[in-house]
Amino acid sequence: MKAILALADGRVFTGKAFGARGEVTGEVVFNTSMTGYQEILTDPSYCGEIVTMTYPLIGNYGINPEDVESGRPHLSGFIVKEACPYPSNWRSTTTLDDYLKQNQIVGIQGIDTRALVRHIRDNGAQTGIISSIDLDPESLVEKARKAPSIVGRDLVKEVTCKEPYHWTEGPWDLSEGYQQQTGEPRYKVVAYDFGIKRNILRNLVAIGCDVTVVPATTPAQDVMAMNPDGVFLSNGPGDPEPIQYAQENIRQLLGKMPIFGICLGHQLLALALGGHTYKLKFGHRGGNQPVQRKAEGQVEITSQNHGFAVEGSSIDNTAVLTHINLNDNTIEGLEHCKLPAFSVQYHPEASPGPHDARYLFERFADLMEKNRQSQG
């Protein structure tokens, strides 16, 4: 069945429908990862986005019930050069096409993804539409232009949990799969769910944390009443500026206990400190972004997924910039000058991606231990 991708600037691509049939709008972005499409599909940070995979063949190892980062896909649509119809992997239980159909995700394949990615790179991420219903290019371009922008929207409320819950699952093991937490946890952590990935929670369990996940709107007073050793600020979708309630809660929690933020959590921490954020031209999405630790000069290859960044000069008086992106010199990490609070823009938990930065979870544990000892 024919399908069309149309961008708000008038560019049109014709291909074949796969996954669910229908019509969806979203910000068209690209991810440079060769693998990890299942984790990408289920990452809540992609809410409101139509994701293009730059690797030409996607779906060749199928879909399994374990490698998911949330309970369902959150992205608006999926674009690939070719979707593999016959996957081969010992863990696979279904095809990519069937998985998208089951979850009502509209996809398009067979377009020139190289041309699309170059267009986004040169002209910036923009609103687009995929349709297998309306096949009139002019009509679709007009719909794309009228679709809401991702800027200024609170997408966190669309992906956060409704009620608090306890997380006990640890990282995956080749012989045993995902293991439940054993032994007595060392630290009690409250994790704000702005769109949290499960592998972040697994890494918190791995360092000995008893993790309680709370909705994004949970008041700071309720968190403090839980008497945690630390607070974690999760990843999440879209523009951080409208998430005013989270910024205010973070301000109230600063100095009360150690705080660690990742991705959107990093941006929200910066905003809570009086900083500013801005929209990147086409964002960082992939598992091969080089980041330098400024103190040591050491380089990490990192997994990233964000379309906004922190303006470095806006937080000079309150925080130290700890990491920079070597591709474009954007801010990748910060640390409060006096209080036990730090964050990174990238994803140390990977999933998918490299594990160069998992030391950051241990650093969070060290801060909680020092804070506990200082309180006697």
Swiss-Prot record:
The active site is at 263 (nucleophile), 347, 349. CDD domains: GATase1_CPSase. Residues 1-184 are annotated as: CPSase. GO terms for molecular function: ATP binding; carbamoyl-phosphate synthase (glutamine-hydrolyzing) activity; glutaminase activity. It is an enzyme of class 6 (ligase). It catalyses: hydrogencarbonate + L-glutamine + 2 ATP + H2O = carbamoyl phosphate + L-glutamate + 2 ADP + phosphate + 2 H(+). Keywords: Amino-acid biosynthesis, Arginine biosynthesis, ATP-binding, Glutamine amidotransferase, Ligase, Nucleotide-binding, Pyrimidine biosynthesis. Its EC number is 6.3.5.5. L-glutamine binds at residues 45, 236, 238, 264, 267, 305, 307-308. Disulfide bonds: none annotated. It comes from the Bacteria. Pathway: Amino-acid biosynthesis; L-arginine biosynthesis; carbamoyl phosphate from bicarbonate: step 1/1; Pyrimidine metabolism; UMP biosynthesis via de novo pathway; (S)-dihydroorotate from bicarbonate: step 1/3. GO terms for biological process: 'de novo' pyrimidine nucleobase biosynthetic process; 'de novo' UMP biosynthetic process; glutamine metabolic process; L-arginine biosynthetic process. InterPro entries: Anth_synth/Amidotransfase (IPR050472), CarbamoylP_synth_ssu (IPR006274), CarbamoylP_synth_ssu_N (IPR002474), CarbP_synth_ssu_N_sf (IPR036480), Class_I_gatase-like (IPR029062), CPSase_GATase1 (IPR035686), GATASE (IPR017926). SMART domains: CPSase_sm_chain (SM01097). Residues 188-374 form the Glutamine amidotransferase type-1 domain. The keyword Ligase applies. Belongs to the CarA family. Small subunit of the glutamine-dependent carbamoyl phosphate synthetase (CPSase). CPSase catalyzes the formation of carbamoyl phosphate from the ammonia moiety of glutamine, carbonate, and phosphate donated by ATP, constituting the first step of 2 biosynthetic pathways, one leading to arginine and/or urea and the other to pyrimidine nucleotides. The small subunit (glutamine amidotransferase) binds and cleaves glutamine to supply the large subunit with the substrate ammonia. Composed of two chains; the small (or glutamine) chain promotes the hydrolysis of glutamine to ammonia, which is used by the large (or ammonia) chain to synthesize carbamoyl phosphate. Tetramer of heterodimers (alpha,beta)4. This is Carbamoyl phosphate synthase small chain. It comes from Syntrophotalea carbinolica (strain DSM 2380 / NBRC 103641 / GraBd1). The lineage of its organism: Bacteria, Pseudomonadati, Thermodesulfobacteriota, Desulfuromonadia, Desulfuromonadales.
